[in-house]
From Swiss-Prot:
HAMAP family xrefs: ProA
EC class: oxidoreductase
Gene3D superfamilies in the record: Aldehyde Dehydrogenase, Chain A, domain 1, Aldehyde Dehydrogenase, Chain A, domain 2
Reactions performed catalytically: L-glutamate 5-semialdehyde + phosphate + NADP(+) = L-glutamyl 5-phosphate + NADPH + H(+)
SUPFAM superfamilies in the cross-refs: ALDH-like
This protein's name: Gamma-glutamyl phosphate reductase
Annotated TM spans: none
Keyword Flavoprotein applies: no
Family stated for the protein in its record: Belongs to the gamma-glutamyl phosphate reductase family.
Amino acid sequence: MNEVLAKGIKAKEVARELVLKSTEQKNEALSAIADQLILETAYILEENKRDIEEGKAKGFSDSLLDRLLLTENRIIDMTEGIKQLIELRDPVGECVSAWERPNGLSIQEMRVPLGVIGMIYEARPNVTVDAATICLKTGNAVILRGSSSAIHSNKAIVAVIHRALKLTSLPQESVQLIEDTTRNSAKQLFTMKDYLDVLIPRGGKQLIDTVVREASVPVLETGAGNCHIFIDETADKQMAFNIIINAKTQRPSVCNAIETIVLHENWAEQYGSELFSSLKERGVELRGDNKAVAIDSSILLATEEDWETEFLSLTLAVKVVSTVEEAIHHINTYGSMHSEAIITENEENVSKFFTSVDAAALYHNASTRFTDGSEFGFGAEIGISTQKLHVRGPMGLPALTSTKYVIRGNGQIRK
């Protein structure tokens, strides 16, 4: 029996045990994991260093290396996320709705775990912690399949989680890692519908598209982040500068960083040159349309591919438009339905933008960088869904549950 199948069978078995665990037992396990991560930080960082060194030898980009990198502060952030998760209400067993029928039947809709969750993701070892802990909180078993680039980090983190779970009432096999990082193991995971209840891909567009295309298991799609900010003609200059710089340069390798700014031509004529200079001072390479190049001749002329690209680096596309409607059309044409923002003092244009733009998260006068489970108050998230069925946006605890109906009677039969 190969690794993927064996772990699928074990996960199905463990899921039946997890559904019986109380909130207190699950929280004790989460607390143990947080403590163990701190206790074994040096070990995790040493294994992460191996991934970084191998990545550099393979010529990985700076943005990929950043996604791969763990630091003491990033591990502390992980544990803080776990502590927030402990404080959140456990949705399992929650009554979503209840009513009584004229025949006396009492019907309740109750939240229950999904069962076994498969998680396939790239580079980021922090996802290993996020996925494991949020699945445990919601009573789900999880099978993790990271990329070869992070294999040492992922193996170390899962080993630490297992050592923590050994001290609790939850089975160690509640969290399992597929150590085979070949394409064959991924392909088998895609098709394990007898053992997986849902598969969640988290990574670049190519990975997500492959999973959606090839999986026979139900997929919760976490889309790529080709995010935009539209600066309307009434936008406050300093606010716009602060938001754009934050949304692009704070951490360009993440999915909620912006990839294109759309400028109203009147605003661009007044402030565009200064904004472009400010971005270039921070190492941003600009690629713009003809109107943007006319304002700053050092800007590279954008191609069709640039509008479609999630750069995940200090590269930013620039589009200049005449109206809010033109901005909305561009965003709906090229956006990935992740996070989109408008900076304006015109409430009518805010209303148009919020009504017409199709995305999981829409912002007025704020950075797109807030599309995140922690920032939304969800605690650790398992991903940001860009699809419309089941759940959309940052996927917190309720996203990893389903419902079942519990009907109580006193002898009723159907006539």
